Amino acid sequence: MRVVFALVFTILVAFASEISIATYNVQNLFDCKDDGSEYLDFKVGVSKWDCEAADSKLQRTRQVINALNTDIIALQEIENEQVLKALVSDSEYKFVSFTKEKTSPVGLGLISKLQPSGSEVFKVPNVKTRNILKVIFETEGKKFSIFVNHFPTYKNGINMQKKAEKTLRTALGKEKN
């Protein structure tokens, strides 16, 4: 049985409002359309992946999202923005942000019940995948940012991880308290 790990945070904004935040690696949420960047395991006609498998994975992921029931959820390993929108259709999550490199099979997303006031993408230099997504929120006159990232795997080398870490540190350094 696969165990789903989600890290849930609750933050207090100016000690007045409570906002719950989670992060969830959906572990390759793909549709059944070939856009050319899929992993081989998710190519229809080449693997066991088909529309039925894609719909089943979408429904199971939607159940986890609904069970989390947080205000904001950062998501990793989503194929495209259309899959992200399908995931939250008919839900309380009305706002989505997404980033993906053209050559990457998966991207990062954020879904929210709160309307973001902006977003920014940080490209990790010399790494073909794994942008860092920053989504900005404002509530009760206070701004806060959520950074969504998914560092390269260790098998790709520690240097790629260090580049991602440096990019995130630089982005965080630009934040005002």
Protein language model features and the residues they cover:
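Phosphate/oxyanion-binding active-site loops and adjacent basic polyanion-contact surfaces
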Residues: 53-57, 125-129, 160-164
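Loop/turn elements at helix/coil->beta-strand transitions in domains of secreted/extracellular proteins
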Residues: 17-20, 68-72, 92-95, 117, ...
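Sec-dependent N-terminal signal peptides
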Residues: 3-15
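N-terminal, active-site-proximal structural segment of metallo-dependent hydrolase catalytic domains
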Residues: 15-90
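Short, solvent-exposed loop/turn and secondary-structure capping segments
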Residues: 32-35, 85-87, 121-123, 147, ...
